[in-house]
């Protein structure tokens, strides 16, 4: 360590010290930083091509990967292949959090391929790795030669016993009723992701206000490290549309774009008319610009649509589909439409439609989740699918991408606080949201449809849950908050803010801001208030369709019963080589799951089959009771008496003197092998040996 040239910047946030280190690991990267808190260490590296991609684009070619090395927690990966492979759900979600925090801060027109990798090197099981990953990633970019100049920091805000905590420990997080990851710059908020247990709108705002001072401290620390170890930024030249094309667009085509947007067409009609206008534009400039004509026309039309749609909102308070800023699209819902599914709902909001289906399973159907900190069974799952046909696109079906995983997790987090506890409803629950149509807010359709589907399945939820996506149009000091945004408003707007919850409070919160300076707390307060109003309107609609969970689960769902047996009886229930449990499941047509703590779950196709399996289990795991009368089977005859099997695996001695009231010379005078005999337990000694009597019953 003596030859290492390390530069360090320490910063205290709350009561915890965070260290930023550079100059000693991954030195060939454009920027590399280790963020450390306690014994938790996250290395982030930033590498960029120095050449712009050809063409004009407003898309930043940024790739972010968050990786957890199992050695960080002193573990070896499970499974057949003993190495890390496909990204876990946590790694995917953490990658999205980092990406969403960084992307708005890259300069306009920057198209150099850029990779950011955050790698967990050490995990002490105390401190969170995700906020350290955001911090390390931003700092790696700040000190690098990459033209990324605005630091972004993230903190985790939890509320424990009514008190807000900055960066709670992993143990504290388990008891928090609110858990938000919030990132921002010195200017404002950029990204929020988290969940809560039906908290108020005011509580969420307080959490954001608690986060801002901590974010400012962390951003300043990055700038201080840059002063010590920063590199000179390389310059780039962004390509632009030729001025003659811009002028033609403004002078001839702007008015036509405005007319199309002011006609309040539906998505398909509007897209067709804009495409026709683009084709005419491209044809007009083809002679002057050749093969670039279509690209230049497309970019110009995109810019004109951006400007005119925003002007429509800010100047007239009207959106491109004719709605007011706080107006919700038309709602329509159906439940119980799939006869064999355990629960189903078709939720439609405008041109966005989700088919959401609930399936009930047993504890054996739970998803095993393994992380650096712990392993556990996930008994509530929500999977989101976004096929190409939902937007009229012809594209191949592939495995779920980051977007699908992220949307599914948001919807799962929204519904999770309202799912009943396992002791009240012992089913594993899987909800699948298949998006049938999409024109914005499909994740919120998954939440609303998911709630209705769970109600239809007879899941006794604590309350119904609705969700809404909000947008923002901001030019200077003038702005408008939009309720229930559609696809165009998401694409051309400055914010995508999603809020979910019951009538009692908020359960999930997600926000992404495209403005480099973020947005203020004041705008967020207005957005939250407007979102709550819209969410209650949607909730009223849902209540009109299915106001409460159905009283019973589907007749096609398994019948489940949970019981507990002594842990020392688990072996007796399973039997040698699984003989006993296999016999029970086959003869009763049931599925039986046995936990190490003695909890046994029986799933059957009907109540009769379940009762048969339950009786078999009780028989195999019962304890012999003193003074109780049993009908047992003679399994062994000895000169001194007979051994009688009282319950499976448990015999008692019936001494020759206890067989009959009169004296007998041989046991065989009264009993023979296989006889069923009624006996009473008269003694159980300290070693568990059982003595029986027949004569006391004669």
Swiss-Prot record:
Classification via CDD domains: KH-I_PNPase, RNase_PH_PNPase_1, RNase_PH_PNPase_2, S1_PNPase
Catalytic activity: RNA(n+1) + phosphate = RNA(n) + a ribonucleoside 5'-diphosphate
SMART domains xref list: KH (SM00322), S1 (SM00316)
Subcellular location as annotated: Cytoplasm
Positions contributing to Mg(2+) binding: 490, 496
Matches recorded under InterPro entries: ExoRNase_PH_dom1 (IPR001247), ExoRNase_PH_dom2 (IPR015847), ExoRNase_PH_dom2_sf (IPR036345), KH_dom (IPR004087), KH_dom_type_1 (IPR004088), KH_dom_type_1_sf (IPR036612), NA-bd_OB-fold (IPR012340), PNPase (IPR012162)
Annotated keywords: Cytoplasm, Magnesium, Metal-binding, Nucleotidyltransferase, RNA-binding, Transferase
GO biological process: mRNA catabolic process; RNA processing
Cofactor: Mg(2+)
Residue span(s) of domain S1 motif: 627-695
Domain KH span(s) in chain numbering: 558-617
Protein name (database record): Polyribonucleotide nucleotidyltransferase
Organism: Elusimicrobium minutum (strain Pei191)
